[in-house]
């Protein structure tokens, strides 16, 4: 039964992998709703700056990862599935096996935290783990089938999502084997950065609108 369950999770992960760039859009309506009438402390400049910093930490992680990856690696492919001619083990991949998903987490949470709703942030964090865990399982099954023992040896010493700076084995930085390509980052990431900034502005707009309606109702 366990192998069958793993097979089912892998199958679902492959389906989610193809649509992983679009499925998070289902969070937009509830995030906007939660942002409407947010607690007053969520409007403070310091807290908003913190949320922006969390979001751009995610952008930085993704940029550092993408800027060094060689062509032909497992990456964006929403119609044909996964492609990997090279196994990434250096740069950000020497710290965690899924640095892009770690970056995504910070970008998601930046917008969720900006709503000022702690319970909503907790729910989204749990949904994120359930969502990306299946995608990661499918990706790892694909890479293990492709690269065999080489992949298994690397994966046994590198954590999946959170760098390990204590105990053994401990995450250790291995410099990327190729130079950083800003052009590649801009080509790959401008949509994500635009979506992040647009999300903040939409949340701010809904919050301002909600505050205006509340003030009008008390007149």
Where are these regions (language model features)?
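Membrane-anchoring alpha-helices and their flanking helix-loop junctions
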Residues: 1-90, 106-219
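Conserved SAM-binding loop
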Residues: 94-108
């Amino acid at each position: 039964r366990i192998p069958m369950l793993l097979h089912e999770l892998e199958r679902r992960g492959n389906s989610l992998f193809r649509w992983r760039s679009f499925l998070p859009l289902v969070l937009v309506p509830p995030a906007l709703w939660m942002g409407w009438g947010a607690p007053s402390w969520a409007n403070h400049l310091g807290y908003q700056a913190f949320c922006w910093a969390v979001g751009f930490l995610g952008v930085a992680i993704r940029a550092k990862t993408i800027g060094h990856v060689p062509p032909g690696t497992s990456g964006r492919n929403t119609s044909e599935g996964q492609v990997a001619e090279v196994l990434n083990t250096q740069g950000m991949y020497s710290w965690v096996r899924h640095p892009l998903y770690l970056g995504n987490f910070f970008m998601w949470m930046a917008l969720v935290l900006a709503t000022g709703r702690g319970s909503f942030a907790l729910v989204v964090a749990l949904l994120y783990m359930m969502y990306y865990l299946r995608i990661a399982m499918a990706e790892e099954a694909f890479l293990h089938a492709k690269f065999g023992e080489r992949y298994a040896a690397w994966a046994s010493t590198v954590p999946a999502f959170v760098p390990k700076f204590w105990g053994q084995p401990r995450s250790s930085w291995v410099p990327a084997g190729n130079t950083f390509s800003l052009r590649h980052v801009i080509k790959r990431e401008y949509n994500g950065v635009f979506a992040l900034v647009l999300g903040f502005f939409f949340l701010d707009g809904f919050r301002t609108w909600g505050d205006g309606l509340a003030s009008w109702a008390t007149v």
